[in-house]
Amino acid sequence: MHIARIPRTAATLASVAAMMCATLTACAPSGGSAAQSASREGTIAVGLPGSLSTLDTAHETGIINYYVAQVVSEGLLAVGKDGQLIPAIASSYHTDDAQTWVFDIRPDALFQDGNPVTIDDVLFSIDIAKDPDKSPSSAVYWPAGVQAEQSGDNQITITLPAPAVNFGWTVTANGGLWITEKSFYEAAASYGSSADLIMGTGPYKAVSFQPDSKAVFEKSGTWWGGDTPAQTIEFDFFSDENARFLAQKNGTIDIATQLPIDQVSQFQGIGGVSVLTESDRSYVGLTFDQNVEPFDDIHVRKAIAHAVDRSTIVSSILKGQATVATGIEPPDQLGSEIGEQAATDAQAGLPIDSFDLDAARAELAQSKVPGGFSAELTYPSSIPDLGSAALAIADNLKQIGINLTVTSKPIEEWISEVGSGTYGLSFMSYTSTTGDPGEVAGWLLGPDNPARYENVQVQGLIASQAAQTDPSARVADIVEAERIAQDNTIYSPIWWGKTSTAFSSRVTPTQYTPYFFMTPWASSLELAK
């Protein structure tokens, strides 16, 4: 799906996101540099639907940040094409009780400057990852009280305050750990900036970065995983989807990710271009903040939820490239251990405020604002499908007396306001980056959730599911937490999505799966000579 993953804390910098504008010239890049890069032998140019303000994913956890991170950074573990955990900087790991995790550090791992990865570097990186000041967008992945220490010549042990069967995802570059060189980080005035760049262990090293324009990475020659097909990976940032389409058509970019639904057929019509569509295990819905009036009134929340025509949004706006959501966990995400159909069945009975304008009017009449009110719903300009859905919702709300203003914002600004209390009504666009069955619910229903929702029973269930070793029991806890929250209309699920990516004839992905861009994907491209 085309949406971006949004960060897990209200204090995060801007990005998601899936969880990413309309003249025919690119807002960025400029000067024909993308054309030069795509035509240069050994270079792959990737057109992203948005921009980065930093290369430090710990400060900006948008989905396109994660795409970029996979070429330059690694954690202790990584995600394979099947969504399972695989070795990265740790050559192996084990845990007997899901509380004590032992990692054997790869002795041949090097940073991109040729220096070896030391235990001190790994422990330093973990300290940075846990620190909410240094990792404002991702420190929430790390439970309070976690301890990491050296336990052998090339071994570390991480001890959690309580068992967490999903902790393995935390130490991936898809979750909350990007191993860096201590001396490089400490010498940087602003790690991840255009001046300081970034240091990692991945197959490509950062050589230049222009926020809102491009980021360029060259093959490092130091990666433990071996050689990679391209010499250079260039990410070009587009805020104008029409400009990105023209760039693909003219051959100035090789890959375009997260295509808008209404442009998929246009990309398919470009000679030599292949468009691949897969589930991205994403969730889109409305979020209600009970701490903001009048959304503290359940009748107001239900009035709005009843005015959302999910089926029409999916069939018309999304052209069937999504599924009407009955819960917050996409079935292929929730079912990663028990199976997608079992997960679908588990969520089939969840309470949902179905589309019914008469019911919406009745709820509003019982509320503290029976005469209606005005509100604002914002969406990121790089996710036009959200804007179209918002306008459809606004049209329905107008019929019951609620005046909803729909506002487009730069994705950085939009994300910075998520969970901040600025709005009582907001979109949630979340694209999973791991194979953890409880990833979405773990944030949306956990203690630092963007709805600022406090419910002891719900958050107890979220805590207990993380310790469940029985996959079915774990899903049962997650679904029960969803049931309570949806019964109170804290979230109003709309759709579970898919994403489409365009590849030029110069580039062929191998083993393309829903997890492709969450793996070290640059090593899985075949580049035409």
Regions found by a protein language model. Give the residues of each.
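Alpha-helical secondary-structure segments
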Residues: 118-125, 155-159, 202-203, 230-232, ...
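Structural transition elements
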Residues: 323-363, 384-386
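Ligand/substrate-recognition segments at binding pockets and active sites
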Residues: 361-432
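Ligand-site clamp/hinge motif
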Residues: 216, 220-266, 403
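N-terminal lobe/hinge region of extracytoplasmic solute-binding protein
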Residues: 47-96, 127, 199-200
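Detector for C-terminal structural segments
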Residues: 19, 210, 308-337, 385-394, ...
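Surface-exposed binding/hinge segments that line
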Residues: 94, 104, 139-184
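Gly/Pro-rich hinge or "lid" segments in bacterial periplasmic/extracellular proteins
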Residues: 84, 173-227, 232
